[in-house]
Amino acid sequence: MATPQSVFVFAICILMITELILASKSYYDILGVPKSASERQIKKAFHKLAMKYHPDKNKSPDAEAKFREIAEAYETLSDAHRRKEYDTVGHTAFTNGKGQRGSGSPFEQSFNFNFDDLFKDFNLFGQNQNTRSKKHFENHFQTHQDGSNRQRHHFQEFSFGGGLFDDMFEDMEKMFSFSGFDTTNRHTVQTENRFHGSSKHCRTVTQRRGNMVTTYTDCSGQ
C-alpha cells in the first residue's frame, strides 16, 4: 500500500514531467503552423512573426528571445533535409544534437551573409535602425553557429542553397518589383541612399547569375 510520502513524490514527478513537456514547444508550435504545413505556409508564418517580435519593433523584455526562437524554428523547417530529420527524431532529440550527426550532414553548412547590404538595400525597419536590426540577426545566427560547432566559410561570391536568406532575398525581390532576368539569366539591382548630414551618395549593386550572388557598395562624394 502506498504511503503518503510515496504519493507526494509521485505527484511531484508527474508535475515536473508535465512542465517539461509544456515548456518544450515544437518548432511547428512556435511558428503556429500544423505539422503538415507547406513551405509557403511556413515562410508566411515566419515573416509575420518576425515582423511582430523584432526587437526594434517590439519593446517587450522577451521580444528578442522570442525572435531568436522564431528564427531557429524557421531555419530548421524551411530546409527539407532538416525538417525530415526533425520530424523523424522529435524535438527533444533534435535540439540535443542527435539530429545533427553523420557525414555530410546538411547541418554542418555555414550561413554567412552581408547583413549591411540586406538592411541597407531593403530598409525594412527604417534607415536609423538598420545597424541594430543587422546586429540582432548577426547575434542570433552567430550564437546558433557556435552552439552547433559549424564550420565558418568566408567568401564574397556565394550561393544561396535555400533556407532563411534565400527565401528573404526572393521575397524582397518580388516585393520591390526588381527587374527580371535577361538572356544571360543575370540581373543587377541598384539602390541609392543619401546619408544624413553629408553629400555622399552610395549605391549597392547586387548581381545575380543563377544562384550566385555578388554584392558590392559604390560610394562617391560631391
UniProtKB/Swiss-Prot annotation:
Q: Which gene underlies this protein?
A: DNAJB9
Entry function: Co-chaperone for Hsp70 protein HSPA5/BiP that acts as a key repressor of the ERN1/IRE1-mediated unfolded protein response (UPR). J domain-containing co-chaperones stimulate the ATPase activity of Hsp70 proteins and are required for efficient substrate recognition by Hsp70 proteins. In the unstressed endoplasmic reticulum, interacts with the luminal region of ERN1/IRE1 and selectively recruits HSPA5/BiP: HSPA5/BiP disrupts the dimerization of the active ERN1/IRE1 luminal region, thereby inactivating ERN1/IRE1.
From the UniProt annotation, give the residues forming the signal peptide: 1-23
Location (main, coarse): endoplasmic reticulum
Q: Which residues form the J domain?
A: 26-90
What segment(s) does the record annotate as region Divergent targeting domain? 91-222
Q: What is this protein called?
A: DnaJ homolog subfamily B member 9
Domain text: The J domain stimulates the ATPase activity of HSPA5/BiP, while the divergent targeting domain is required for efficient substrate recognition by HSPA5/BiP. The divergent targeting domain specifically recognizes and binds to aggregation-prone sequences.
Recorded superkingdom: Eukaryota
Coiled-coil region list: none
Query: Cellular component GO terms, alphabetically?
Result: endoplasmic reticulum; endoplasmic reticulum lumen
Which keywords belong to this entry?
Answer: Chaperone, Endoplasmic reticulum, Phosphoprotein, Signal, Unfolded protein response
- Matches recorded under InterPro entries: DnaJ_domain, DnaJ_domain_CS, Hsp70_co-chaperone_J-domain, J_dom_sf
The record describes its quaternary structure and partners as: Interacts with HSPA5/BiP; interaction is direct. Interacts with ERN1/IRE1 (via the luminal region). Interacts with DERL1.
Per the UniProt record, the source organism is Cricetulus griseus
Q: Name one GO biological process term.
A: negative regulation of IRE1-mediated unfolded protein response
Query: One GO molecular-function annotation for this sequence?
Result: misfolded protein binding
Q: Where in the cell is it found?
A: Endoplasmic reticulum lumen
Where Phosphoserine occurs along the chain?
S133
